[in-house]
Amino acid sequence: ARTIATMLLSDVDLKSYTDTAYHNEELKSLTRYRFDKVQERAKLKQSVSRLVTILFPELEQLVSSIHGTSIYALLSEYPGAKQISEAHLTRLANILVKTSRGHYRKDKATHIRDAARTSIGSVTPAKSLELKHTIKLIQELTSEINEIEDAIRKIMDELKPPILSIPGMGFHSAAMILAEVGDFSNFNSPD
């Protein structure tokens, strides 16, 4: 009580807790949370690269990226060169065509299966299981990141910060800067 009375008697100009301050705290929490999730996903992607190198090293030379949706779908169902080499070509082609929205065709499935048949990759059921689970975790993290980004976008749409009008300033960068700096009017000068 004494502290409150002293504070009220002193001539301190107290600012009320505004919606902007609330949104800033929310934005700060969300951008930091998103950053952590992206870092976590990056580590898992490194694990996928390591596991593919063990199980089917030739795959990286056959596709533009092993981290695409279609390759994840393929590896989720056939997590290794041995499994791919034994798969029916029509099934492989269907997975690739469907998940790549036509980017990959039957000829790509044929190339991948042929490479799998002559692969130097190890046949390791434990690593294959780890690969499947790691891909599931990446997909779940991607879903969570998208949900976080939707929440960030909602706050940014409410705030309509002028920082977004800066050429080259992306949505994520603007949100992170705004979250960490807060209200720019709190600064007397640019220095």
Listing of model-derived features with the role each one plays in the protein:
Residues 1-191:
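A detector of single, family-specific signature residues
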